[in-house]
Each structure stands twice: as C-alpha cells, then as structure tokens.
Amino acid sequence: MVKSMRTRFDEQLRQLNVELIRMGSLCEEAISIAAKVLEGEKNISNERVFAIEGEIDQLEHDIESLCMRMLLQQQPVASDLRVISAALKMISDMERIGDQAADIAELCPYVGDTLAQGRLHITNMARAAVSMVTESVEAFVQGDLKMACKVVQDDDKVDELFLKVRAELISCLKEEVGDPEAILDLLMIAKYFERIGDHAVNVAEWVEYSITGIHESNEHHPQNVL
C-alpha cells in the first residue's frame, strides 16, 4: 500500500512538473508577444496576450487542485511538502506575470513611437524577463539550486534597464519632448516589466526553498521551515 501510494504521488509530481512547465511557457509567450506589440510588429495582436492570460488563470486553478489532492490523498514527507508548498507560491507569482503582460498589451496602443531608445531598453527588459521565467521553472523541475540563484542575480540587469528608461522618460517630460501621456504610459510599461522580473525572482526563491527548506525572506534569521 505504501509503495502504491508513493508511486501515485510520483505520478502526480510528474504531472505537476508538466503543468508548471506549461504555465511558465505561457508566461514567456505572453511577455514576448507584449514586447512585440510594443515594438509595433505587424501581424501581432494584443488580443493573444489577453487569451493567454485566461489560460494562465485556468492553469493556476488546475495546479492548485492538483496540489490539494497530493496533500489530502497521499502521505508526503517533509521534502515533498516543501515542493508542493513552493509550487503553490510559484503559480501565484506566475499568474501575476500573466496579469502584468496583459496590462502591458493594453497600454501598447497608446504609446505610439515614443522614445525609440527607451523602447529598446524595454525590449531588453522583456528578453531578460523571459529568460528569468524560463530558468526559474527549469530550476524547480530539475532541482537546480545554482540556476535558481542565477535568476535572483539576473534581476539586477532588469532593474538597471528600468532605471535607464525612467531617467530618459523623466528627461523627456522635463524638456517637453513628445506626448506626456504616451511617455507616462511607456514608463508604466517599463515598470510592469520590472515587476515581472521581481515575480520571476519570487519564483526562484521558492525554488530555493523547495530544495533547502530555507526561504530568502528568512535569510537574516535562517531556519528550516520543514
């Protein structure tokens, strides 16, 4: 009986990994499409981002249900509990990534051709964010602590790019260059990409917790949570 329960748990764990990879892939797609809409790429519609957001929301619900079944029907040991609780935290951040990609897509039509250089920095922010999401999910599936730590470090690049964009856009506002409303919308888009990077870091930190039992928020007073 114990063996069959463990076998069933391992099957559910594989399913959890598959669904997390799918959710991460959708987040990556949403970010990439939003960036292409911002760049004005033809044959790309922000409606696709809104559709992906709905798929991400559904996956969050599905993964929550799977995790609850794993907790209620199986007999997870401490390390298993860390994996399940980390997954529940991760999907919350990935759902927010989907929301913010949709927020970006909604603002894109209003920015026009505002500040080409600033848009280049934002495109680079988007690329970095996609990479961070990819690596954070891969780190969870592979149990790769080093990769999770790399994601946390990579957030500095996104933050630096955001500061550059903000400085350039504030300068435009002061010098009255361009449409002020479009500039503010572009600044908000940059802020959403910066927040996406923060959510990817949150995911990576929960990966670290799933492996070590220690969460980054407790770094000054480390303790084994489970």
Please provide the spans of the model-predicted regions.
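Cytosolic, long alpha-helical scaffolding segments
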Residues: 1-226
